[in-house]
Amino acid sequence: MEKFKKSYHHGNLREELIEKGIEVINEVGEEKLSLRELAKMCGVSNAAPYTYFKKKSDLLYAMSDYIWKILAMELDKTRKKYENREDLLVKLGKTYVMFFCKNHRYYHFIISRNNTKIDLLSEFSKTENNNQNAFSILKVEATKVLQKAGVSNQAIQDKIIAMWALVQGLATIVITNNINYSESWEKKVEEIISSVCIIAPL
């Protein structure tokens, strides 16, 4: 059972609709998703989902926001736990990879979306979307480390993109079903990130 999968009751219908919707899209595609079908799956009236989502696009946005919010919360926990430690970036990277490793359905849903926005600029925007918040945690902490290491401002953006590419690529490899690997991914992911997370001033 995946880490964040829960037993739902109608008192938490919004979250149940989101989780069921993610399952439907991953299994049969977005075109098969409807609020009426989700109501049936959740055992509630056809009108119940409209309390939370006026239309299908509202539900789709909420699904993405829901996943990124959970990831942001996990990254924030890691940041607080390892704050001021030299291996903070490694731990954050591991948290990112293992979050999707333990929640395949979230990963498959996110990569199927074409409306996810990630701000790769070195400047920090005031956007409040949860996908921006999750990435901003990685970006803020990486920037602190890079600046402390004497990395030039011009190079910081490139290094942040490279770091994100690393964890995103690792997540893809770990989740891909036809890749065989005998060792523990949880241990190996941290070792891999540590091996390439060497900050050199530019």
Language-model regions: role of each:
Residues M1-N12:
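N-terminal intrinsically disordered/low-complexity leader segments
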Residues L13-I22, L38, M63-L71, L75, ...:
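Generic hydrophobic, amphipathic alpha-helix propensity
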Residues E16, K20, V24-D58, A62:
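Helix-turn-helix
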Residues A62, D76-R105, N153, I160-M163:
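Hydrophobic alpha-helical connector segments
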Residues D65-K91, H108, S122, E128, ...:
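Amphipathic alpha-helical linker/stalk segments
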Residues L75-D76, L121-Q147, Q157-I161, K187-I198:
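Amphipathic alpha-helical packing segments from all-alpha helical-bundle domains
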Residues K102, V140, K144, M163-S182, ...:
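Amphipathic C-terminal alpha-helical segment
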Residues K102-S122, T172-N180:
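Amphipathic alpha-helical segments used for helix-helix packing
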